[in-house]
């Protein structure tokens, strides 16, 4: 392996740089890698300054803004990649966390000798049938183009790349690792956050962390909570995150008369404190790759009631159950009502795959191996 005198730069490609799932995973690794050896730059497909931009710059990274790909702007989009890599062709690798356009920029990267990595974060596609069809065609080409393939779970890998790639030598699991020590339950933080939210000690606080969007299915959770509240008045529902369905979800809360019972925090940078404040974590997603928030909730000692659509690979301890959304609202109300409550202070869940300190070192070694 060549001796390193300056950090080698890896170009991270994402849809945007808000605090979403894929972005959180990337930033966790970024913080814990040795940035004297590996440094990240970012492509963001947004026309505004991103939420994470200042943080990235403070860590030594650079952010470049590209137009969002719309099919009709294919020539313009491809030209921007050609011009960009013509002037920035010293990257060790391009790590595509937004693989829908990877078939466009991977051949350009190879022209300049840049290694390419395709990374899957989900086990389902969104969008209309035309968009999904175009993405499938794009992914088909990526399967033959990329030098390496990663996914957050086996299920996401098979969905995005197919069995032949997942069972081949170029594929690996890139765990959605976190700082385990950060998510350990804190009685002090619990009291602080509950005081801030005006939640009393004897009130049950049900929590959910995730983008306010269709896949996360918070609308179903609100309807479940509405029915649950009839059996246990005084309970509260805490929704941490923002997203494109925020207004619609808030309208549902008002329609059901839950304005004083459902708490919206928006995006926060101290999720771990809010997890300590919760009593129970409920996650009724329609689909996921491997949700970081469920890993975090388990590490915080919360009992988790999770949709059966979520891969079982997310289980890192015994305090989680997987339930079918088709069982309906009453079934989920019953599961919440019968969820076990236990002391969280002495819980000590350890899982080396999800320990960011270990995972970041492995990622660093992988990137550096591309030098040989």
Model-predicted regions and their roles:
Residues 184-199:
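A short helix/loop element that forms part of the nucleotide-sugar donor recognition site in Leloir-type
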Residues 267, 286:
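Aromatic "clamp/platform" in nucleotide-sugar-dependent glycosyltransferases that forms part
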């Amino acid at each position: 392996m060549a001796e390193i005198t300056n950090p080698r730069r890896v170009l991270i490609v994402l849809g945007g740089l808000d605090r979403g799932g894929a972005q959180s995973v990337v930033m966790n690794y970024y913080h814990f890698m040795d940035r004297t050896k590996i440094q990240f730059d970012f492509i963001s497909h947004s026309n505004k300054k991103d939420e994470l931009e200042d943080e990235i710059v403070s860590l030594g990274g650079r952010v470049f803004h590209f137009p969002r790909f719309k099919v009709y702007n294919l020539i313009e989009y491809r030209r921007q990649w050609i011009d960009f890599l013509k002037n920035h062709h010293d990257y060790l690798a391009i790590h595509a966390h937004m693989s829908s356009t990877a078939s466009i920029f991977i051949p350009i990267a190879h022209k300049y000798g840049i290694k390419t990595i395709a990374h899957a974060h989900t086990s389902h596609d969104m969008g209309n049938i035309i968009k999904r069809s175009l993405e499938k065609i794009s992914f088909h080409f990526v399967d033959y183009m990329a030098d390496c393939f990663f996914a957050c779970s086996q299920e996401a890998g098979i969905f995005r790349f197919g069995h032949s790639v997942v069972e081949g030598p170029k594929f690996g699991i890139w765990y959605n690792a976190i700082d385990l020590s950060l998510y350990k339950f804190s009685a002090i933080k619990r009291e602080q956050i509950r005081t801030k939210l005006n939640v009393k000690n004897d009130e049950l606080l049900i929590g959910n962390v995730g983008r306010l969007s269709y896949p996360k299915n918070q609308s179903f959770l609100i309807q479940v909570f509405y029915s649950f509240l009839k059996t246990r008045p005084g309970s509260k529902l805490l929704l941490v995150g923002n997203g494109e369905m925020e207004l619609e979800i808030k309208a549902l809360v008002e329609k059901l008369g839950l304005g004083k019972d459902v708490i919206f925090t928006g995006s926060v940078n101290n999720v771990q404190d809010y997890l300590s404040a919760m009593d129970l974590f409920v996650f009724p997603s329609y689909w996921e790759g491997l949700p970081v928030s469920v890993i975090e909730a388990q590490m915080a000692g919360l009992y988790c009631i999770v949709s059966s659509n979520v891969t079982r690979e997310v289980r890192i301890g015994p305090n989680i159950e997987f339930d079918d959304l088709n069982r309906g609202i009453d079934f989920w109300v019953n599961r919440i009502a019968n969820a076990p409550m236990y002391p969280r202070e002495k819980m000590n869940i350890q899982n080396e795959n999800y320990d960011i300190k270990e995972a970041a070192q492995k990622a660093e070694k992988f990137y550096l191996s591309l030098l040989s």
